[in-house]
Amino acid sequence: MKRDPIYGIMAEFDSAQALVDAARTTHQAGYQKIDAYSPFPVEGLAEEIGFHHDEVPLVVLIGGIIGGLSGYLMQYWMSAVDYPLNIGGKPYHSWPAFIIITFEMTILFAGISAVFGMLALNGLPMPYHPVFNVPRFSSASKDRFFLIVFSSDKKYDPAGTRKFLEALAPRSISEVPS
């Protein structure tokens, strides 16, 4: 798969409110693939760029269910099928004794799923990211706010998107090479 030579167009803003307003306007204009970078969390920004965070809880739920089932079935197999021991006349399949390990396996698998699911869904580890090619982007961790429209967006047009971002009155606009 050939990479697009341009990753997107990035606009730099002076304040968090200007970034939120620009993100709102950009999203309302029909751009779907946008992202924002700021030196601190900005309230309301995630909603304005159309961020939805519903994948990780589902991954954790599936991991927890798999962990609980595997813990329970492992104990059932060992005590009732593989090596049945009649101890004090108790049944081989004594489910109350299985609760603790089943619970622990549920928590273990859910926790591992949360960590690896978050890493996978965030595309990590990522030692290289195209936004680092923009010289002014180093200010994103200090005092500047950036909004990028990705070239993979359906509405993206190099000239039209640049003109649209210029109308938002940013401090500067940069093309982000891949």
Give the positions of each predicted feature.
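Generic detector of intrinsically disordered, low-complexity, polar/charged segments
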Residues: P5, P41, E47, V60-G64, ...
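Cytosol/matrix-facing juxtamembrane amphipathic
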Residues: K2-A36, E43, P84-I100, I107-S178
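Membrane-helix interface motif
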Residues: Q75-P84
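Hydrophobic alpha-helical transmembrane segments of multipass integral membrane proteins
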Residues: I65-G68, Y72, M105-V115
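Cytosolic juxtamembrane regions of integral membrane proteins
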Residues: D35-P57
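Short, structured active-site "lid" loops
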Residues: F51-Q75
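Alpha-helical transmembrane segments
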Residues: V59-I62, T102, T106
